[in-house]
């Protein structure tokens, strides 16, 4: 579990870490120190003008008060303003990406107090405070100023965090801020293994700067691959260290068989129309990448995203699995994104009323007890509640204990999809083509061509298929192992008793608080059928399921008539995880990774061939509202040679090639 820093303030008002007996920044002028030591000595201003990519990546060991980050953001904002004034918009860096590692994060109350000392940073500080993560280990992606600044804030040990990262072979970091506490007081932040790990994720030519001039630090960084030198330190300090990476670590482990160095995205075709495609378009728009949406329906969100109320909460297990890691961080990112959309004026009906997962059967009681015993998840993310506590939360009497997701709730999916599409269009206008069923994809020397009813579209540098159950409809993707699951949600009239319900209830299905005088009740699960016809039998099944668990409750027995329903086919896979990544023909993998049949130890022997520009983004099932936003960021970050918000193990768990790889390892193909 992540533990907050234990601090006090000295006579100058500077925060001091009690566990390390060291100050977070200079008593004299912390802001000036930050600028001189890190920003100026890494020559950031000049490099922002001449960098060969649209994004610049800085990594910091020791986030602390966030002062270095906020100060850098302020100067980067000034850089963008100068570009605008000078109309130099066709070159120079457009997005700042900041990676920071923090083992003992400050509490949000301590951070708020500390940052009041820097009123000139207020606009950025307020954004940081409003998004500041809960104490969950791993990468928290925070976004500032319409996505022009991205902070990947890792909670946990720096070395262990770097080991989890997914990155291309050429590296991702352009500059390092080494700002842990003094080496004599916090030696873990200045160990050789950390320096070597830094090199693994750095580009050749990456620079570093640090306040210390300790000899063992200079020698360690030199041994790792940096050319080091001493320069004048800040204020009264005699010297400090700077360095440049001349070569990468030859002994580094190769990234996984899913990683490639890619050409940046330029013009992308997105096939879909629901939550998944709206997330992709939004991620592309934040980067100013040209795109076009192709939707077979007359309007967005006409398929599986067409429900009136969709529950938003993470699906967590009693173990630190890739599944749990994905959904925990995806949920927190989705909440931040939805809050930002609302703050920006893009409205959609919703209620963050919490989600109460009831233990309606003994196996669920046992599962919830196991969740509590493992203590993997912060109480602010989920907590176990007794029957009495649960009934108080829900506002109705059920008699069930359960797990409560306080930050969960429900949103209106069609409205959310349209809000995201509108927000994307405001950031970077894109084309939309509706009533357009794409029948064929063809790769040419100039890019991808799309065909529909005798019309040709393109060429496009990349195609991202977000078509749900129809994602396997193309010659290139017919081998996708999609599991289609039909589901029907019923809309039932609220009663005086049922309107007392204050939170979403989950049992075998789900039941929402009243909205427009109705509750959403469902959903059915039926495999091997593609019918979208609403049936009375499924309405009866939804009511029977509710009464089976809540037949003793007034809110359930007093409900009115079912007046409407929605039916759709969810797209999923047998491991209940989505797909986000490049789609490669099975024959290519069979050739490139034949050694996988000899055992897992051969999994890093080769990389598959250069990406062809066809990508899959589907399989979210009933959890797209939770997981699609962060998975979208991960996919577009990967395709744009940016830092990725999901770990290497999660990247592999959701990659389209995972089933091929598993079958090779098991010698099934």
Swiss-Prot record:
FAD-dependent cmnm(5)s(2)U34 oxidoreductase: annotated segments: 271-669
Cofactor(s) in the UniProt record: FAD
E.C. designation(s): 2.1.1.61, 1.5.-.-
Tree of life domain: Bacteria
Pfam family, one: Methyltransf_30
Catalytic activity: 5-aminomethyl-2-thiouridine(34) in tRNA + S-adenosyl-L-methionine = 5-methylaminomethyl-2-thiouridine(34) in tRNA + S-adenosyl-L-homocysteine + H(+)
Family assignment from sequence similarity: In the N-terminal section; belongs to the methyltransferase superfamily. tRNA (mnm(5)s(2)U34)-methyltransferase family.
Role according to the record: Catalyzes the last two steps in the biosynthesis of 5-methylaminomethyl-2-thiouridine (mnm(5)s(2)U) at the wobble position (U34) in tRNA. Catalyzes the FAD-dependent demodification of cmnm(5)s(2)U34 to nm(5)s(2)U34, followed by the transfer of a methyl group from S-adenosyl-L-methionine to nm(5)s(2)U34, to form mnm(5)s(2)U34.
Protein name: tRNA 5-methylaminomethyl-2-thiouridine biosynthesis bifunctional protein MnmC
Species: Pseudoalteromonas translucida (strain TAC 125)
Gene: mnmC
